From Swiss-Prot:
The lineage of its organism: Eukaryota, Metazoa, Chordata, Craniata, Vertebrata. The gene is Abcf3. CDD domains: ABCF_EF-3. It comes from Mus musculus. This is ATP-binding cassette sub-family F member 3. The modification Phosphoserine is found at S83, S155, S157, S161, S283. Residues 129-171 are annotated as: Disordered.
């Protein structure tokens, strides 16, 4: 096949050497920039027109460019145009020069000394156009990572019910049950739910469970925005975003969430002022009396005390309850959003992973509080103990459908196993029955005497319901690489460490802790007690004000932050993310690393922003383990992970040959992994000999003393 150089020589035999070198250089170095033949014509067309001496018209020049463009595209996969070749032997330029006299010109230079018949200005313009095109392409690549990615939004559709529509429009629908039948939910071209039904009975507490990325959070959003039709008379609240910070005190912010009470108080103030000023009409005194009656009915005078109890249960001290909301961090504002929802008492409360923002103490309080919740709750949670404590029903999202189960999570596990076992038995029994009938049909298909029986058997097969084999969810397996040499203690320790950000507020005083490669340590304590600060001291990210941090010279720490999503570039794929962090490896290596944590196939090539919370966590695990650390420090690693992945993470940490220190609020995960429990409080860290059972008992006793139980 002719090369671009061959095409140039055959079409333009008189082409100048300098122009020939320039055009071939443009063709090879800029081939990636030619998205169409028009780009190639724009780059070299004028030069070739000049070279032809007007012997070729525009169509002729375009035809030549088309031939060269086709040649470039065909050669592209091999990518051999600019490949480097290893020489068989070194070239000695001095030996070559000996064959020429001093006045003799080298052959290559003779060509370059020939006069050029091409307009120099046109040559400069062509070079400028090519440079501009390359800059434009580079700018596109920069924008790809700097601009926030615009993701597709979820959509929902559902079958309508004329009866329900008539009841809704007439105002006769007084039921507080939520019943949505035969609906679909999709995210772009991905179908999350197809022909699904959801039934939420008034006063029941539903736990919504399922693997990461199947659409649990999306379903909550569809309900919260009423994209799925929820009766208009049912009030609902979705705890999703943190409270905006302003000068409103935390306690007042919670009180304002009860819009009915706030509206009545506003009317009471306005009427009282009018009556006091002598401007009231005769009926307004009666209106004021009616408002007082309504305020008494909703126990408005007890509202501040009730709001204060909720805030205290979620960890707000009396001083914090009077602080402006703008002074709180994002985590505390999320707690404030939860407090507002609990205080407002909607007919349908939607909670998405509420325990992620809470410490163990606040979770135990929330469990106790929700057990007496009067209306309906739908909560997404991967905390088994939390669901066992609060759920009356479980909704399982899988295979694009929703299956309902009565009872808490442990009851759900047993019921699901029994259902799957029965489903498999029914399927196998029907398959045997079908085979038995099919044998009869095949045997007597061409027997005229048995024709009626064969037809009868065929009809029997047609009438049998179509049973499908059980969809078994794939097992989640995680493994942390541990191909490193063991080394002797001391491995990692803090000795008599003092630390503070502000000298007036000490965080740690004379802190002494240590860990080795056998350690499985869990750190618990209230938010703000210094758990994350201690982890940063152990890693060396923070330096002690006084005292010593000692780390073994061979120690290699892998760190998982509870804010790991903020450290990921959300605009690129998971594969590209690893390639940028650890350059120089083949793409298959990055894919293999991601596959170890369940990010495989199409998932690995999707923008990280489009992944679910749990899938983003898996990407963070893949990134953390890539350098093969021998010690892991994990800050809330179970946030957003589904239950199967939490179990797999626990097993992987137990099998890991190095050391582990983690902060977690997940009781089951703590019991699964940890051999040692540290409690962080009052500027120190103490070891609890009785483990989590003793710590839980201490918290329950504290609740009783404070009047929460």
């Amino acid at each position: 096949m002719a090369t671009c150089a061959d095409i140039l020589r055959s079409e333009f035999p008189e082409i100048d050497g300098q122009v020939f070198d320039y055009v071939t250089g443009v063709l090879h170095s800029g081939s990636a920039d030619f998205e169409s033949v028009d780009d190639l014509v724009e780059a070299v067309g004028e030069l070739l027109q000049e070279v032809s001496g007007d012997s070729k018209d525009d169509a002729g020049i375009r035809a030549v460019c088309q031939r060269m463009y086709n040649t470039l595209r065909l050669a592209e996969p091999q990518n051999q145009g600019n490949s480097q070749v290893l020489l068989d032997a070194p070239i000695q330029l001095s030996k070559i020069m000996e064959n020429y006299d001093c006045d003799t010109k080298l052959p290559g230079l003779l060509k370059r000394e020939q006069s050029s018949t091409v307009n120099a200005k046109k040559l400069e313009k062509a070079e400028a156009r090519l440079k501009a095109k390359q800059e434009k392409r580079s700018e596109k690549e920069t924008l790809k990572t700097s601009n926030p990615l615009v993701l597709e939004e979820a959509s929902a559709s559902q079958a309508g019910s004329r009866k329900e529509s008539r009841l809704e429009s007439s105002g006769k629908n007084k039921s507080y049950d939520v019943r949505i039948e035969n609906f679909d939910v999709s995210f772009g071209d991905r179908v999350l739910l197809a022909g699904a039904d959801v039934n939420l009975a008034w006063g029941r507490r539903y736990g919504l469970v399922g693997r990461n990325g199947l659409g649990k959070t999306t379903l909550l959003k569809m309900l919260a925005t009423r994209s799925l039709r929820v009766p208009a008379h049912i009030s609902l609240l979705h705890v999703e975003q943190e409270v905006a910070g302003d000068d409103t005190p935390a306690l007042q912010s919670v009180l304002e969430s009860d819009t009915v009470r706030e509206d009545l108080l506003r009317q009471e103030r306005e009427l009282s002022l009018r009556i006091a000023a002598g401007r009231a009409e005769g009926s307004e005194a009666a209106q004021l009396a009616e408002i007082y009656g309504k305020l008494e009915e909703i126990e408005a005078d007890k509202a501040p005390a009730r709001a204060s109890v909720i805030l205290a249960g979620l960890g707000f001290t009396p001083k914090m309850q009077q602080q402006p909301t703008r002074e709180f961090s994002g985590g505390w504002r999320m707690r404030l959003a939860l407090a507002r929802a609990l205080f407002a008492r909607p007919d349908l409360l939607l909670l998405d992973e509420p325990t992620n923002m809470l410490d163990v103490r606040a979770i135990l309080w929330l469990e106790n509080y929700l057990q007496t919740w009067p209306s309906t709750i739908l909560v997404v949670s991967h905390d088994r103990n939390f669901l066992n404590a609060i759920a009356t029903d479980i909704i399982h999202l899988h295979s694009q459908r929703l299956d309902g189960y009565r009872g808490d999570f442990e009851t759900f596990i047993k019921s699901k196993q029994e259902r799957l076992l029965n489903q498999q038995r029914e399927y196998e029994a029907q398959q045997q029955y079908r085979q038995h009938i099919q044998v009869f049909i095949d045997r007597f298909r061409y027997n005229a005497n048995r024709a009626s029986q064969v037809q009868s058997k065929l009809k029997m097969l047609e009438k049998l319901p179509e049973l499908k084999p059980v969809d078994k969810e794939s097992e989640v397996v995680l493994k942390f690489p541990d191909g490193f040499e063991k080394f002797s203690p001391p491995i990692l320790q803090l000795d008599e460490v003092d630390f503070y950000y502000d000298p007036k507020h000490s965080i740690f005083s004379r802190l002494s802790v240590s860990a080795d490669l056998e350690s499985r340590i869990c750190v618990v304590g209230e938010n703000g007690a210094g758990k994350s600060t201690m982890l940063k001291l152990l890693m060396g990210d923070l330096s002690p004000v006084r005292g010593i941090r000692h780390a073994h010279r061979n120690l290699k720490i892998g760190y998982f932050s509870q804010h790991h999503v903020e450290q990921l570039d959300l605009n690129v794929s998971a594969v590209e993310l690893l390639a940028r962090k650890f350059p120089g490896l083949p793409e298959e290596e990055y894919r293999h690393q991601l596959g170890r944590y369940g990010i495989s196939g199409e998932l690995a090539m999707r923008p990280v922003a489009s992944l679910s919370g749990g899938q983003k966590s898996r990407v963070a695990f893949a990134q953390m383990t890539m350098p093969c650390p021998n010690f892991y420090i994990l800050d809330e690693p179970t946030n957003h992970l589904d239950m199967e992945t939490i179990e797999a993470l626990g097993q992987a940490l137990n099998n890991f040959r190095g050391g582990v220190i983690l902060v977690s609020h997940d009781e089951r995960f703590i019991r699964l992994v940890c051999k040692e429990l540290w409690v962080c409080e009052n500027g120190s860290v103490t070891r609890v000999e009785g483990g989590f059972d003793q710590y839980r008992a201490l918290l329950q006793e504290q609740f009783r003393r404070e009047g929460f139980l």
